């Protein structure tokens, strides 16, 4: 019996200018790419054309919905904005329902402070569960987001973050 690679897209959950989460998403995406037996795609919600005059499944984005339906699991990279998650991410997530059922999801929180997005993860978990996603035990926490990467977008403390991502991805898959 032939096995296919697991498809685990990474979703960058913010569209703000100057977003520090973009480098985190690229780092996480790179870590998934290094894993044997995995395929991935980086989905940036900034590039999705979602109308804002409706809600829920009425505004499904065909490509996003197809990608989520095909996925074996998901990784969300989410910045912490005043202890919460970006409204646009919630708007995008609400556009699908059946596509999420029983899929594993891991969340990487990003924050300027020292908690590594823990508070955004705490606030997002009930939403993910309500959507039918199965949340994993380990989180990806990225503290001090503005200082994590050098001017070329490379993570400074590669060893520490690679170890954390190895644990995170091991739990997810």
Residue ranges of predicted features:
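His-Asp phosphorelay/catalytic-motif detector in bacterial-type signaling
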Residues: 101-102
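Short, glycine-/small-residue-rich phosphate/pyrophosphate-handling segment
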Residues: 105-145, 160
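Mobile beta-alpha loop/short-helix "lid" or hinge segments that flank ligand
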Residues: 41-50, 98, 132-152
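Hydrophobic transmembrane alpha-helix bundles
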Residues: 42, 73-86, 113-123, 141-150, ...
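N-terminal beta1-alpha1-beta2 submodule of the flavodoxin-like/Rossmannoid cofactor-binding fold
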Residues: 1-96, 155-173
């Amino acid at each position: 019996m032939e096995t296919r690679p697991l498809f685990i897209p990474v979703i960058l959950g913010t569209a703000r200018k100057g977003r520090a989460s973009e480098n985190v998403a690229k780092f996480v995406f790179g870590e998934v790419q290094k894993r044997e037996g995995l395929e991935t795609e980086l989905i940036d919600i900034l590039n999705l054309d979602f109308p804002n005059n409706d809600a829920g499944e009425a505004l499904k984005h065909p490509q996003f919905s197809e990608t989520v339906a095909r996925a074996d699991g998901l990784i969300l990279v989410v910045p912490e904005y005043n202890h919460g998650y970006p409204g646009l991410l919630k708007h995008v997530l609400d556009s699908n329902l059946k596509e999420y059922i029983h899929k594993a999801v891991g969340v990487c929180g990003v924050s300027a402070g020292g908690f590594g997005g823990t508070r955004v993860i705490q606030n997002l978990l009930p939403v993910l569960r309500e959507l039918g996603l199965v949340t994993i035990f380990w989180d990806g926490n990225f503290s001090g987001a503005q200082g994590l990467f050098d001017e070329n977008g490379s993570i400074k403390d590669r060893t520490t973050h690679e170890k954390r991502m190895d644990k995170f991805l091991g739990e997810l898959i």
